[in-house]
């Protein structure tokens, strides 16, 4: 499989993946719409990600919602790595048609073409998301393994941000979420990613194509957009700090995420492309370590040597999860995947990269006003 199509290949994960595959002598085609939200008004000037790949790949400016663009991009390919997606969890709650059209509709178009036209595709690798788990797996002292429902506005407005047992109502203990955990997304983005993965795993085996899915945790590292206020708290916090603006920590600052470095994500994805035994499997990709958001903010201020006010405000967004971190046992077993980048090591590299970039316009307040207007920010 030496001819590989990467949709969203000018994005953060896609561009890094493309460059690594080129190093491994793959012929890479990229299909990307160069979304303004990610790449700016003039990608030639404002998108280092696009510039890093545009002369090294067969680049097609187009959309996964266009059958014509898919047909052009799929010509001569052996495999597809489908990364193109709208990715803002909060934004998905009020731009519903956009998220469903791109994430579900784009995947449906791909599968329709593969089902009804001649092609050489042997494997489809699709990016799902940890968002499909919703709150994920927990343990209750009385009820054992449980999967909490979405947190209630009536609890959070009183400062009770932790998850409750759906059976007895007690607070529950976070544990690592495995791939066979209950699927219970709490955002439109999560629902779209769930359906995207289900479509691929349902259709591909019927047409002789191997499906492989990755549920990425919170991916970060050099190259990620510093101007997009809808995804990535490391970028959001960094842009706030560099502009001398304070950081508003949602909830109580104890909410956690599993932050996984871009190089580890690229490594896992290539293993999923190349490993025969990966066919038909879904893999978590993370570090298996939970880091709280307050620690992220303090660490970034320390790395940049800039002090800004850090306020734990008690504000919250409907649709956000409280905690999640991945169990990566399956990826270790089948793919031989082992994350090499700890959070401390990764954030050091990320901060060094940010220090070399132009300070971006801080659009965070604009995104908050949008969510307030939709009743999603409390």
Positions of predicted regions on the chain:
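Hydrophobic "lid"/C-terminal helical patch
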Residues: 17, 269-273, 297-300, 347-354
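Non-catalytic, hydrophobic alpha-helical segments
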Residues: 265, 269, 285, 296, ...
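N-terminal Rossmann-like NAD(P)+-binding domain of SDR-like oxidoreductases, especially those catalyzing
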Residues: 1-217
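Conserved short acidic donor-positioning loop in nucleotide-sugar-dependent glycosyltransferases
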Residues: 33-34, 288, 316
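Conserved C-terminal active-site "lid" loop/helix of NAD(P)H-dependent oxidoreductases
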Residues: 262, 317-338, 359
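Amphipathic terminal alpha-helices
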Residues: 26, 343-378
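C-terminal "lid/loop" region of Rossmann-like NAD(P)-dependent oxidoreductases
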Residues: 252, 282-283, 292-297, 305-323, ...
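Glycine/proline-rich active-site loop of Rossmann-fold NAD(P)-dependent oxidoreductases
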Residues: 194, 207-212, 219-235, 243-245, ...
């Amino acid at each position: 499989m030496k001819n590989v199509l990467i949709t969203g290949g000018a994005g953060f994960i896609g561009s890094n993946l493309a460059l690594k595959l080129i190093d491994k002598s793959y012929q890479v085609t990229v299909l990307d719409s160069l979304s303004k939200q990610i790449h700016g008004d003039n990608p030639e000037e404002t998108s280092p990600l696009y510039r890093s790949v545009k002369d090294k790949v067969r680049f097609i400016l187009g959309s996964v919602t266009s059958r014509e663009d898919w047909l052009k991009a799929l010509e001569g390919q052996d495999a597809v790595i489908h990364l193109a997606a709208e990715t803002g969890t909060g934004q998905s709650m009020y731009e519903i048609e956009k998220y469903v059209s791109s994430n579900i509709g784009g995947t449906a178009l791909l599968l329709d073409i593969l089902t009804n036209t001649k092609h050489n595709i042997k494997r489809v690798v699709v990016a799902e998301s940890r968002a499909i788990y919703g709150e994920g797996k927990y343990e209750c002292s009385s009820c054992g393994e449980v999967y909490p429902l979405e947190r209630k506005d009536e609890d959070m407005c009183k400062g009770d941000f932790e998850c409750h047992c759906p059976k007895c109502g007690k607070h529950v203990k976070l544990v690592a979420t495995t791939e066979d955990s209950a699927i219970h997304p709490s955002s439109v983005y999560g629902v779209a990613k769930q359906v995207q993965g289900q479509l691929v795993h349902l259709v591909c085996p019927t047409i002789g194509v191997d499906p492989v899915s990755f549920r990425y945790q919170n991916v970060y590292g050099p190259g990620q957009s510093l101007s997009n206020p809808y995804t990535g708290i490391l970028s959001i916090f960094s842009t706030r700090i560099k502009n001398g603006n304070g950081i508003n920590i949602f909830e109580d600052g104890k909410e956690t995420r599993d932050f996984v470095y871009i190089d580890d994500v690229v490594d896992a994805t290539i293993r999923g492309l190349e490993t025969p035994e990966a066919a038909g499997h879904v893999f978590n990709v993370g570090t298996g370590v939970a880091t709280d958001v307050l620690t992220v903010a303090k660490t970034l201020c320390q790395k940049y040597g800039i002090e800004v006010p850090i306020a734990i405000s008690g504000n919250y967004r409907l649709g956000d999860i409280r905690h999640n971190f991945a169990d990566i046992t399956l990826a270790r077993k089948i793919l031989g995947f082992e994350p090499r980048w700890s959070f401390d090591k990764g954030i050091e590299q990320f901060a060094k990269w940010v220090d070399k970039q132009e300070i971006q316009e801080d659009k965070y307040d604009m995104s908050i006003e949008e969510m307030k207007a939709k009743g999603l920010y409390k």
